[in-house]
Amino acid sequence: MFKTESIRHAWPEKAGFAINRPKGHWQYTFLHFFNSVEILAEGKLTKAPPHACILYRPGTPQYFISRQPLTHDWIHFSGDISGA
């Protein structure tokens, strides 16, 4: 069971927008990107295609940047997503 803490749909940002959370966030974070972004995952900066999604566990480092205007959906949620 999990609880949605905050959510935004089709949220706009300016070109160059970045999130840099070296220690992550205290909640799960789900992101859906309408356009291409660069995501740091497993130590590598990777260009993700439009409509890519990523789910971060609490405390997982988060970094992404959009070189163009960005539109994205995001959800912060807490709880146990294991289903156990």
Please annotate each region the language model reported.
Residues 75:
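Glycine/small-residue-rich loop that forms an oxyanion/phosphate-binding "nest" at active or ligand-binding sites
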Residues 1-49, 60, 66-69, 80-83:
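Generic protein-terminus/edge-of-domain signal
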